[in-house]
Amino acid sequence: MNKKLEHRFVTELESNQNIVHKICSLYTNDRDSHNDLFQEITIQLWKAYPKFRGESKFSTWMYRVALNTAITLYRKSKRSIKTQDYDSVIFKIKSNEYDNTQEEQLKLMYKAVKQLGDIDKALIFLYLENKNYKEIAETLGITEVNTRVRMNRIKGKLKTILNP
């Protein structure tokens, strides 16, 4: 990867890393797992970046790669992240420590969301990020109608979980 492309990747990732941290919070239960998943998502983004065509916003593309990575790793019963000798640039990215205390109000919601299925988690996450149904559908690769139907079902499930 040339230096200009490398610099653009690092800049984009640093400015959008909170998206990755939020996804990590949805799919992990402890700080070490969170950091491991963050690193794996960063590696997958780095590997896929040369194929990014710019047909969508970087953040939309990043959501898709990050969610697919998180879901894939979440589904594996035994996580075995293979470490390879990647270009050192991906480890130069300054990762702000994610401060869970700033989101105390969302703890109950996250706990409820963690009880949902993989795709439903991704869908509600994008909804909570103020993405519209069209953007959610494009990111997850499902139809807009399916997105609306699933969202209504998810809202019902969350109401049941939060108000037993």
Question: Can you name each region flagged by the protein language model?
Answer:
Residues 1-22, 35:
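A short, charge-rich alpha-helical start-of-domain segment used by transcription regulators
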Residues 80-109, 132-133:
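Internal acidic/polar
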Residues 36-43, 47, 56-68:
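Structural recognition of an alpha-helix C-terminal capping motif at a helix-to-coil junction
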Residues 140-164:
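DNA-recognition helix of helix-turn-helix
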Residues 51, 64-84, 102, 153:
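Arg/Lys-rich amphipathic alpha helix in sigma70-family domain 2
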Residues 115-135, 139:
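Short amphipathic alpha helix immediately N-terminal
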Residues 41, 65, 123-124, 136-137, ...:
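Hydrophobic positions on the alpha-helical face of helix-turn-helix-like DNA-binding modules
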Residues 12, 16, 20, 41, ...:
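Residue-level preference for hydrophobic side chains embedded in well-ordered alpha helices
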